[in-house]
Amino acid sequence: MPQASELGPDEVVFRLFREHFIPDGQKYPNGEAFIPSSIDQDDAKKRGIPVRVTVWDQALTTPSQAKFIWGFNQPVMVFKIRVRDVIQLRARIQRLSMAVVRDPLIATDKAGAEGHCGFEGLDRNKDEPRTKYKTLLDEVAQLCHESARL
């Protein structure tokens, strides 16, 4: 399997969230919004790649396109994350598996599919204490900046 290319530090990605991931009065989602789903885990196993949580390259995909591709009918909130911030967090906490990589959707010809990316390093390591893992997810969530509501 070819290695995925990591996005550069000047790039920005976004993630769609349903409102239940945003605590009342909070500026960013809670860390649970970044826990890889069973679908993320199954996809990684099938493809022989690291577990990836979906994010989108804002230069290639609009939030409306991402919402359509995912088939979301409910309102969503759009939060941006600067890749530079992810790289700095990775260095600070020494989580070398953390990266934002290109992962275009090839099974669809829908507009914006080429902007699909994966946020790696968010799955819990075998011997990682739950409190340390929760702190990691909360720190990632704090990198988010609200961009829109759709």
Say what each PLM segment does.
Residues 24-26:
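Short, solvent-exposed loop/turn elements at domain surfaces
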Residues 17-22:
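Contiguous, amphipathic alpha-helical segments that mediate oligomerization or scaffolding
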Residues 1-13, 28-30, 37-53, 59-150:
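Conserved NAD+-utilizing ADP-ribose enzyme module
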